[in-house]
A protein has these predicted regions:
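Short alpha-helix
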Residues: 116-121
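Class I SAM-dependent methyltransferase SAM/SAH-binding core
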Residues: 27-66
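A short acidic, Gly/Pro-enriched loop at the edge of an enzyme's catalytic core
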Residues: 65-77
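Conserved alpha-helix/loop element of class I SAM-dependent methyltransferases that forms part
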Residues: 4-22
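A short SAM/SAH-binding and catalytic strip from SAM-dependent methyltransferases
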Residues: 76-88
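A short glycine-rich, Lys/Arg-flanked "PGG" loop and its adjoining helix->strand segment in the class I
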Residues: 90-105
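Conserved Class I S-adenosyl-L-methionine
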Residues: 126-168
Length: 168
């Protein structure tokens, strides 16, 4: 099963929309088994990954809400299906902002409450793609396989892919 809606093609599309080129330094926040990390490295990026429960020796073990990296040390942050399950997505955005260099790029795809405006404090939104239909298919497959995080009842969600630039 793909670890996020759209799989590798979606990761490559986010990268393209970001405008980042190798050898830019990119951190995968919530890297899991390291599939996107391996893809980034294969593309020529200087990439690192962090996850609470890494499933690859290439991924550092740690809490990305308090990542053990210097401020302003990355050109890009990639996160797919990770900020929502962190329990504090807004803290995750703040940490991403801390880690990015001025003008650095955030490549984000995750669930988003339908009632919330598409705005991320400290970032200028550059592109937004609503991937909700693809996410629904992915979510059904995850439920079938017993590999999903339940969503709160009474709220509506959509799945967005966003590229954003850190405000200076």
């Amino acid at each position: 099963m793909k670890r996020h809606p759209g799989g590798e093609d979606h990761t490559l599309a986010l990268l393209k929309r970001s405008g980042l080129t190798p050898p830019a330094r990119i951190l995968d926040m919530g890297a899991g088994a390291g599939e996107a990390l391996a893809l980034l490295r294969h593309q020529g990026f200087d990439a690192a990954g962090i996850d609470l429960e890494p499933r690859s020796p290439q991924v550092a073990q740690g809490n990305f809400l308090r990542a053990p990296y210097e401020s302003a040390s990355f050109d890009g942050i990639l996160t797919q299906c990770a900020f929502y399950v962190s329990g504090d997505p807004f803290a995750a955005f703040q940490e991403a902002r801390r880690l990015l260099k001025p003008g650095g790029k955030l490549m984000f795809s995750d669930v988003w409450e339908e009632t919330q405006a598409v705005a991320i404090p400290g970032f200028v939104i550059e592109t937004v793609e609503d991937m909700t239909p693809l996410w629904r298919e992915y979510f059904l497959e995850a439920i079938w396989n017993g590999d999903c995080v339940p969503l709160p009842r009474g709220k509506k969600f959509r799945y967005l892919a966003i590229t954003a630039r850190k405000e200076n």
